[in-house]
Amino acid sequence: IENEINSKTLTDNPHKIIFDVLTELKHNLSLLSYCLENKNCIDDVKSKSFSRSLKAIYILQSSLNMKAGGEIAENLFNLYDYCRTTIIKSFTKQDHEEIKKLIPIVSEILDGWKTIKN
């Protein structure tokens, strides 16, 4: 994610970067859920989807302007934090069910983000 984001910062606008990060988060959550459910998944793929999911959440939380964003920014921060803790707990327990529940949440944020004019 970092290399993609770093190369995009020179050409893309912030709206597009957040869109890409949300898309990447959704993809990696799906991949992580699949890997946790299917024990024959390669450990490297599982580990990378875990770490990329956490990096995406860090980027999303770091991008929030808490002062200007007010309650919306605070709610998003808390939602991202919920996702982060759920990912860590689920990865530790090797439980895909809770990860699956995060995908519609991220999808809803992504759908909302698509409606914002940049």
How does the language model describe each region?
Residues I1-D20, K101-N118:
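Short terminal interaction segments
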Residues E2-H15, S33-N40, S62-M66:
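Short, charged, low-complexity loops and linkers
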Residues P14, I18-L25, K46-R52, I72-L79, ...:
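Amphipathic alpha-helix face/heptad-repeat signature
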Residues Y34-L60:
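Alpha-helical segments in soluble extracytoplasmic regions
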Residues I59-E74:
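Short, solvent-exposed, charged loop/turn and helix-capping segments
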Residues I87-I103:
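Amphipathic, charged alpha-helical scaffolds that flank and support histidine-based chemistry
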